[in-house]
Amino acid sequence: MTPHSENTNKAKHFLFVPHGLWGHLRPAINLIPNLLARSPRALVTILIPVAHYQLASKELWKYDLDKHDQVKVIYYGIKEDHEKKDHAKTDLKGMMGFINDIVKVIEDNYEKIVKSEPIYDAYIGKEVPTHPIPPGVVMIEVSTTPFTIPLCEKINEQLGLNVEMAVWTPLSSNYVAWTVCIPSEGRSYRDRVEKIFKAPEEDRTEAYNEQLGENEEVIHVLDNAPVHVFEAQPNQRDNFMEIALGCLPVLPRVTMVHSWPSFLGQEYKKGAAALGIKVPQIGPQLPKPSNHGTELVQGKLKEFLDKTLQERGENSVIYISFGTLLFPANLEQLSILLDVLISLDKRFILALGLSSEEAQLMAKEKIDNSDGKGIWLNWAPQYPILKHKATGWFLSHGGANSTMEAMRTGTPLLFWPADADQVWIANQFPRIHKAGYEFLQIRNGPNIGRTTYTGVKVNGTEQAIRDEFTEVFSKLDEDFGKELREGIRILGERMENDPFTEEDWKAFVEL
């Protein structure tokens, strides 16, 4: 037996099939070097939609994974798509398309992969070899759980394979605590959503408002502060309840792997265990500060930050970005925000993201006429911006990856959440850890006219929004801002030195 074959026999093969959403795909790519550091003999196969070839290839290059002998990167889908996707933005329609694509790639290729047969790579346009041993661990995007996991289980059973099935869950654990676990106070999400879907279709909206949208019962979700149920959707209807409900029956058969700091989800871990669900939380899967590609390149962005640092000092820029899937601010709200920042002579960067065309035209005009107070970008290199000494604040939707980047760079968060885990991170960080502030007057829908659990009435008027923005931005340099900066610093230190995360990494590697 050659040394190579001996190593291969002892190796464990991990198959990763993440979502095409950049917020799910990028951490899955960054997971690979972290896995190899802990399990040097591991073999990895990752299936990536060819639509994200340009972005994914750059991320893989940071770690030389594109030419690593133990890593097979295989692209699927329609090759022409890769020419259309040179940015990270994906809307809800695109998100659902990626889910369908994952189901198809599993249907077409899973049996071939476990048999170590070649499969088709859409980027190079031909079949490529797979690893010589079947996967011992298969981890697939969580939103496809009801469809892909049973498919794989059936093939595993037919072939007599013992494969550990896992679902990739790059979401904060405190959101999944709401959708999966039993709250310490109040009825569960599952109970509420089941009642919604049991209602006749013509009564579905009424049932939704009764169970979630307008419900004023108090819930205390694990690892979160108490809220009224209607506060769980502050800015839009629940986009993901049908997906979540479909996942729930399957979860006890799989391991849910979160790219989230484990110390922030210890109550959730216990609550999930009580339901027979394993939930390792393996911490941030983000580029390390030392990786190439994490520095600003010369251009108007770097010039703006460097100039502001020289003129106004450290922590003087507010970076505004709402992620790559949703854009919670409407035209009027965004206009008020920009007016307040400009009137207060603040320095700011706005990532236009998925804002409407009308909102983009308005924002560009206001910023271009702001006498250099701000700049706008279609897409922003977020981590390098947060690393820059001039950047002091992050006005964010509060997605998991953005939040962990803020923790790593010590940048306090000003939350404007849209949906899903954003809402619960915006609950946990300000109210439990004093590491951010959540804007309340920008809430809409059934939240308007109602009083939050903390006693603030959401008026939602133009004046109320303007007043809240003015108050908060005016005191960022005072004790209010200093407390938030200290809170995020403490969380960042705990994230980088988290024994709970290392315990969960060990559990994942040993699946």
Question: What is each PLM-predicted segment?
Answer:
Residues 1-246, 273, 287-321, 326-511:
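Glycosyltransferase specificity loop/lid
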Residues 164-167, 266, 278-281:
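Short, well-ordered strand-loop elements centered on a beta-strand within folded domains, enriched
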Residues 53, 240, 253-276:
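A short, active-site helix/loop in glycosyltransferases that binds the activated sugar's phosphate group
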Residues 135, 251-254:
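Short, proline-enriched alpha-helix->beta-strand connector loops that line the catalytic pocket
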Residues 257-258, 276-288:
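Donor nucleotide-sugar binding/catalytic pocket of nucleotide-sugar-dependent glycosyltransferases
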